[in-house]
């Protein structure tokens, strides 16, 4: 609760208090500065307004700081550009996934943008897939691992829709849409079907 965060006619009130027509409402806009270490890494900016900025995140860059990644994330890049703002990604992408990341510049913008996007992914999988489909299989943490996920009955609901775009018989390019956002969801679901992502050392085979 901020001092004088919401005032009605000069008097501080709560969000649950009633107001009347004609009351003067004043909101204090107080953003907490970023606590992330700034990074000078160059990440392409696809667009920017007063409310948000859109980055083209490269593969290999985490969105959030985590164990082993304290200064090389998209959050650190944002902190270098906007040290006075907290880092508010509207959604996240896995570290190994490249693509568009939308970052809100205020709590209000984050609320307005939440759920307003529809993401489509492209993935190259091993094997030939001629028809599309849907994988509706729960995903949970693999036994004894802090990193790997797998399909397991007690996992969280996860739904992936996939459509083949092109295949040379050895690999297939897929367009995918997710109804949920579980960690490694595309990688886990495609490996579960028997079509792991090409080059995926975690869920593919050693020869891929």
Question: What are the roles of these predicted feature ranges?
Answer:
Residues 1-208:
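RNA pseudouridine synthases
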């Amino acid at each position: 609760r901020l001092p004088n965060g919401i005032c009605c006619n000069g008097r501080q009130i709560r969000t649950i208090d009633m107001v009347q027509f004609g009351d003067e409402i004043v909101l204090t806009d107080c953003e907490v500065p970023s606590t992330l270490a700034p990074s000078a890494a160059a990440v392409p900016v696809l667009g920017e307004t007063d409310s948000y900025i859109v980055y083209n995140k490269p593969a290999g860059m985490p969105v959030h700081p985590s164990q082993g990644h304290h200064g090389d994330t998209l959050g650190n890049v944002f902190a270098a550009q906007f040290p006075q703002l907290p880092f508010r990604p509207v959604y996240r992408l896995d570290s190994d996934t490249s693509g568009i990341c939308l970052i809100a510049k205020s709590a209000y913008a984050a609320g307005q943008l939440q759920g307003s996007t529809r993401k489509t992914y492209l993935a190259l999988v091993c094997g030939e897939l001629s028809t599309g489909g849907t994988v509706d299989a729960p995903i949970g943490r693999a036994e004894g691992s802090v990193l790997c996920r797998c399909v397991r009955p007690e996992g969280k609901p996860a739904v992936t829709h996939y459509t083949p775009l092109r295949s040379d018989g050895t690999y297939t390019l897929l367009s995918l849409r997710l109804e949920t956002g579980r960690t490694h969801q595309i990688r886990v679901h495609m490996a579960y079907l028997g079509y792991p992502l090409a080059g995926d050392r975690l869920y593919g085979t050693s020869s891929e």
